[in-house]
């Protein structure tokens, strides 16, 4: 059985301050105990430099704990007249290791289709970034028992355009749309059922990828439900939204992942 290192990725969305970065690293330096889990901070692009400075300033204090930096989005284009966009190379130069791709808010609010998501996935890997690919179903889709159908479609487009082995350097985050930012989380059993489906789907085309890829759960994860979620055999950590803006709650989630 593969030993998949748990991950806790904090997606600040359009929130946060440079002060939050400093506060988080102050607590990381004194509270994070080991490298048994990987911690990723995904602030708005304007704060990437603040997070990078904190990473550099606290390198010794972190004592080998795995704290990385990620972005919330990138352009599928390398350069050009795309006002307001940020390329993969720019993110790489800023110190990012990860980038969130296909978040439900991007798909819903900005019209990102599965084809665009697949292009962004490729752009991330082209520039040495590891994509955190988000997939998930809406409330009506779940009620219609179309959860697996929706997730399979979102996965298959990326596989068709990038190949299965592209997932050797990728993370998947299952984020049920009906749980994102609602305070209503999937039960551990619901999360495990979908994570197992995703792993099986990838295993059918590559047993190695299916066994080794990390699959995060995202959708109203809090310190009160994280232990049960992270204890599921196919749940490898969490993509955290609101709780990532509270340094005490986020640190608690990191500690839970390290003990999972």
Swiss-Prot record:
One Gene Ontology cellular component term attached to this UniProt record is:
cytosol
Q: Name one Pfam family in it.
A: TIM
**GO terms, molecular function:** triose-phosphate isomerase activity
Main location per the UniProt record: cytoplasm
Enzyme class, broadest EC rank: isomerase
User: Would you kindly state one Gene Ontology biological process term found in this protein's UniProt entry?
Assistant: gluconeogenesis
Catalytic positions?
Answer: 103, 175
Cite the binding residues for substrate.
Answer: 11-13, 181, 220, 241-242
Q: Per the record's keyword annotation, is Isomerase included, yes or no?
A: yes
Which InterPro entries does the record associate with it?
Aldolase_TIM, TIM_sf, TrioseP_Isoase_bac/euk, Triosephosphate_isomerase, Triosephosphate_isomerase_AS
Name the keywords, alphabetized.
Cytoplasm, Gluconeogenesis, Glycolysis, Isomerase
Q: What compartments host this protein?
A: Cytoplasm
Can you list the disulfide-bonded cysteine pairs?
none
Q: Which domain of life is it from?
A: Bacteria
Catalyzed reactions per annotation = D-glyceraldehyde 3-phosphate = dihydroxyacetone phosphate
| Pathway membership | Carbohydrate biosynthesis; gluconeogenesis; Carbohydrate degradation; glycolysis; D-glyceraldehyde 3-phosphate from glycerone phosphate: step 1/1
Instruction: Indicate the quaternary assembly.
Output: Homodimer.
Function of the molecule: Involved in the gluconeogenesis. Catalyzes stereospecifically the conversion of dihydroxyacetone phosphate (DHAP) to D-glyceraldehyde-3-phosphate (G3P).
Family indicated by similarity: Belongs to the triosephosphate isomerase family.
Q: State the name under which the record lists this protein.
A: Triosephosphate isomerase
């Amino acid at each position: 059985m593969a030993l998949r290192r748990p991950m806790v990725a904090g997606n600040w969305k359009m929130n946060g301050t440079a002060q939050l970065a400093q506060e988080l690293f102050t607590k990381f330096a004194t509270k994070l105990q080991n490298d048994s889990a990987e911690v990723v901070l995904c602030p708005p692009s304007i704060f990437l430099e603040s997070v990078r400075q904190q990473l550099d300033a606290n390198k010794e204090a972190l004592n080998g704990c795995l704290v990385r930096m990620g972005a919330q989005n990138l352009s599928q284009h390398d350069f050009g007249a795309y006002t307001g966009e940020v390329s993969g190379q720019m993110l790489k130069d800023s110190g990012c290791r990860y980038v969130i791709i296909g978040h439900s808010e991007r798909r819903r609010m900005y019209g990102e289709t599965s084809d665009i998501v697949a292009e962004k996935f490729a752009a991330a890997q082209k520039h040495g970034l590891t994509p955190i690919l988000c997939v998930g179903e809406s409330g009506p889709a779940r009620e219609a028992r179309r959860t697996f159908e929706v997730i399979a479609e979102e996965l298959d487009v990326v596989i068709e355009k990038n190949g299965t082995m592209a997932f050797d350097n990728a993370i998947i985050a299952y984020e049920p749309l009906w749980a994102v930012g609602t305070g209503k989380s999937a039960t551990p059993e619901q999360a495990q059922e979908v994570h197992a489906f995703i792993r099986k789907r990838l295993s059918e085309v590559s047993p190695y990828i299916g066994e080794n890829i990390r699959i995060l759960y995202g959708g109203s994860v809090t310190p009160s439900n994280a232990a049960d979620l992270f204890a599921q055999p196919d749940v490898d950590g969490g993509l955290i939204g609101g709780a990532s803006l509270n340094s005490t709650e986020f640190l608690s989630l990191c500690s839970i992942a390290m003990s999972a």
